């Protein structure tokens, strides 16, 4: 080890200690709510269908891009509340905010809808902030962000009409949807508060339950803080026939 490498690693000590405390706070949050911590395999014979995720091959199997499939098997086997910290692997995701190997926190509640999962997330983030002595707010890039729940919410329809001038829930264009999100929609979110984006076009959420009153819209949500995606959630589609039909579409 060179002296530069030694000094670089030594400087990480405060962040590593803070990271360990965050893990403790997250575990305490879920255990207080009767969640079971699990550890599922890192290799799998198949991966969840995600068009924008390229997996790493491991002989004839794949390194897990997420723990979703294994955790859903446990959920179906009768475990009602689960969480885990999982090492995940995705090709082509290297940059300022991405790495091909990263740790994902994933949790499930049997029968819970997407708004319940989002509420879990808001409460967990607030609990972490309190545990770190941050008094319900963080400072990022020199600006304060108030984490007090509930966080502001806006639907995909309203966000795109406001920032980009069109409604992707009635006229979905995947390329335009992605480009306008990065260039117009995300920059329109307030910086001083997190934002929860709700109710995605159904083609952008193939595993999510459709809203009963509008089949063009799926019960999916994503949360953003300081211009970064923090979490996503959706109401699970549990009808096998409908799922097969959605895949065919």
Briefly describe each language-model feature range.
Residues 107-137:
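Well-ordered alpha/beta subsegment
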